[in-house]
Curated annotation (Swiss-Prot):
Keyword field contains RNA-binding: no
Residues that bind FAD: 8-11, 37-44, 329, 345-346
Protein name as catalogued: L-aspartate oxidase
Species this protein is from: Pyrococcus furiosus (strain ATCC 43587 / DSM 3638 / JCM 8422 / Vc1)
Gene: nadB
Record has Amino-acid biosynthesis as a keyword: no
Length: 464
């Protein structure tokens, strides 16, 4: 059996290693793992394994944070495998340096490595994957080839490569927004490609904006752990206006409101005595930007950070296409609900990577050896799409703005895979006539029980 993994972040590497361990031939397509968003992950991974903590506490926090849109079975399934995920990492020699408290969590369960967790974990996984015989091709798998609802393979530079199974682990699409903390090339191309081919997307309207982005010479995240350590959010006049440890949707929205009032928002970390020791990389970055967190306020702004929705999969990470799977941020099966809790994403990456390998091994798919059409799409005007998404499908939404965004999108000449994804977000945000988690409608500011169900997008239509 030959398996292709599209994506070289934490989810993709975990799946590749788990399959290679069973003697399966695995090829990973994508950039160097150091260029993945997983590598940029700062705070850490939520593991409810310490004395005083519990799985049920973590489950409760996740469902409460997800505004009760979560698939409860999936939440239990992922979090109950926390110990296995923890041992997967520690068995590779990875050692965590501290535990932190972050917004929405009722216990300090965020295991971190010097608050630059991704930079320590990803190289270790890549090294072990290579030692296990995983093949790495540093090229982009442009399209997925499907025939009669069965996987055929992937196109790379126009060439069709045949595989028995394809696992999409390409991350989300925060790069579809003008301001993002991730890599700007994270446009969700594989997600849009599959949407064009009839694969359903789930909860695609839920985009998480990190409350405390720093836009300087480059965009950088000031980790949630800094607020967990006692930093306060204030206006230029020194006014505190939000509970810093509220969930990200609430904090991002309140910061954005202040900015709409014409007020600057700052993070006051001057009360953290050991800032340099606890957050060495953030400290170094800020010093390079001319800011000393021991005495200066840090200007912050919300930035697109994480896409909660994605390719619709079941609890075993299967799509409706035989032999096609999706994991990590690229996928959605209801784990996060309407709002992802901080540091739950890396846990999901590990668990979904391990679980999908079990699914593939159990199902033993056989790919179709058929010809498939290659489209060779051109990028087009992606920046115009980014402007539309930021202005019309951002932190605060309303019907007129969403409809205007759709009209503007029709006129843009851009990669159809990018356009269909932007269209999906706008249409599902329009269909969800309520506010829930990361989706906030100014014209429907409250949650409505009749909308406590997932949205499903299938080629041009969003169903709720």
């Amino acid at each position: 059996m030959k398996v292709a993994v599209v994506g070289s972040g934490l989810a993709g590497l975990t799946a590749a290693m788990s399959l290679a361990k069973k003697g399966i031939e695995v090829t990973v397509f994508g950039p160097k793992p150091k260029e993945s968003n997983s590598y940029l992950a700062q705070a850490g991974i939520a593991f409810p394994i310490s004395d005083g903590d519990s799985i049920i506490s973590h489950v409760t926090d996740t469902i409460r944070g997800g505004k009760y849109l979560n698939d409860v079975t999936v939440v239990w399934n992922v979090i109950s495998k926390s110990t296995e995920a923890y041992h997967f990492l520690t068995s590779l020699g990875i050692e965590f340096t501290s535990r932190e408290l972050e917004g929405g969590h009722s216990f300090p369960r965020i295991f971190t490595i010097k608050n630059e967790t991704g930079k320590y974990i990803i190289p270790v996984l890549e090294k072990h994957a290579k030692e296990m015989g995983v093949n790495f091709i540093r090229k982009f798998a442009e399209e997925v080839a499907i025939h009669n609802k069965k996987i055929v393979g992937v196109f790379v530079e126009g060439e069709l490569l045949y595989f028995d199974a394809v696992i999409i682990a390409s991350g989300g699409f925060s790069g579809l927004y003008k301001f993002t903390a991730g890599n700007p090339w994270n446009l969700g191309i594989p997600i849009g490609d599959l949407a064009l081919k009839g694969v359903p997307l789930r909860d695609i309207e839920f985009i998480q904006f990190h409350p405390t982005g720093f836009i300087g010479k480059r965009t950088y995240l000031i980790s949630e752990a800094v607020r967990g350590a006692g930093a306060k959010l204030v206006t230029g006049e020194g006014e505190r206006f939000v509970n810093e440890l509220e969930t990200r949707d609430v904090v991002a929205r309140e910061i954005y409101r202040k900015m709409l009032e014409g007020k600057g928002v700052f993070l006051d970390a001057t009360g953290i005595e050991d800032f340099k020791r606890r957050f060495p990389y953030i400290y170094s970055f800020l010093r390079r930007e001319g800011i000393n967190p021991k005495r200066d306020l840090i200007p912050v702004t919300p930035v697109a950070h994480y896409t909660i929705g994605g390719i619709s999969v079941d609890i075993f990470y299967r799509t409706p296409i035989k032999g096609l799977y999706a994991i990590g941020e690229a996928a959605c099966n209801g784990f996060h609900g309407a709002n992802r809790l901080a540091s739950n994403s890396l846990l999901e990456c590990i668990v979904s990577g391990i679980e999908v390998s079990r699914t593939v091994i159990r199902e033993k798919p056989r790919g179709e050896r058929k010809e498939a059409k290659y489209h060779g799409y051109e990028p087009g005007n992606v920046d115009e799409v980014r402007d539309i998404m930021w202005n019309h499908a951002g932190i605060i939404r309303r019907e007129e703005s969403l409809r205007l965004g759709l009209k503007k999108l029709e006129k843009v000449e851009a990669d159809p895979r990018v356009k269909i994804l932007a269209e999906a977000v706008l249409k599902c945000a329009l269909a969800r006539e309520e506010s829930r988690g990361a989706h906030y409608r100014e014209d429907y500011p409250y949650s409505r029980e009749e909308f406590r169900r997932p949205s499903i997008f299938r080629v041009e239509n969003c169903m709720l």
